[in-house]
Amino acid sequence: MYFHIMQKIQIYDSPLGKLTFVSDGLALTGIWFDKQEPLQQILKAPHEVCNLPIFDETRLWFDTYFDGQQPGFIPRLSLIGTAFRQQVWRNLQLIPYGETTSYGTLAKQIGQQLGKNKMSAQAIGGAVGNNPISIIVPCHRVVGTNGTMTGYAGGIWRKEFLLDLEVKHRR
């Protein structure tokens, strides 16, 4: 899925542990926590640890974010996935900083956008769970219908940390 060209990577030390930035050389194609399966696959394929302007932008974004400020920009992204997944990921980017939405609400929104009466929250959950750009594409802002902390590839404790950080610094 990500291996058509040699991947460029860089490691970022965050308050949540190491994040690996992945790029095609021009845009971000992934941001992964250690031990996530997609990262393990990337590391098995030919890759190069290097410095790129996109990594400089991404480090600045994360430095700003973890300093409790809402970054005023988004690094260039290359979201690789089906049209449906890309639509879900675009909708994730519309969830305001410091706020959450439920899988069901997201399913209704996307169903309306697609002209469908119903959309499965499970289908939405599958797309959310396959988000390749952790934190910048804020899948951590999606919670269970009753506000429960459900499913986060980086671990529920990281999801709680991110939401607490955003709520604390929301303007």
Regions found by a protein language model. Name each.
Residues 2-29, 37:
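DNA-contacting interfaces and partner/effector-binding or oligomerization modules
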